[in-house]
């Protein structure tokens, strides 16, 4: 089982390239895809994330931004007039962007954030704007393990979609054939011993 950052590619690529890439596109992505079920699900997950932050007494700025987002979503649900709905949409997207930025800055391992980042990165990989710069020894190691019949799994805080896209769009081509499965934050925390046991049972 491999991690991604610092294991198969430089941490700096994720921090300096991928995170800013998604951050610059939060607003455009949400506005252009607002009516899609996927985005509505992601916005709902953001609200749930805020509620979880409240439960644990989080004091980071993300908690305050989440409160504003939750209020905006409530306003939209209560609106019946089209003009009010459009105003609510703009308010929600604006609040969501601030919340996503706050989560990013606070380095909160938010599944909701990771899903939205993954959707944005998906477009970037398909358009050729993103390419994963693997360490030089990674392609050979993956190929060697495949020849030996050793299964390789990935576990990262990034969404499964992001992981799949990353290995399918590397600086040396598509290496996804060497990966047997992917785990993300929906599978549990990296620091949880019980979750690690469940991974081994699954693979």
List each model region and its residues.
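Phosphate/adenylate-binding glycine loop and adjacent helical scaffold
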Residues: 111-117
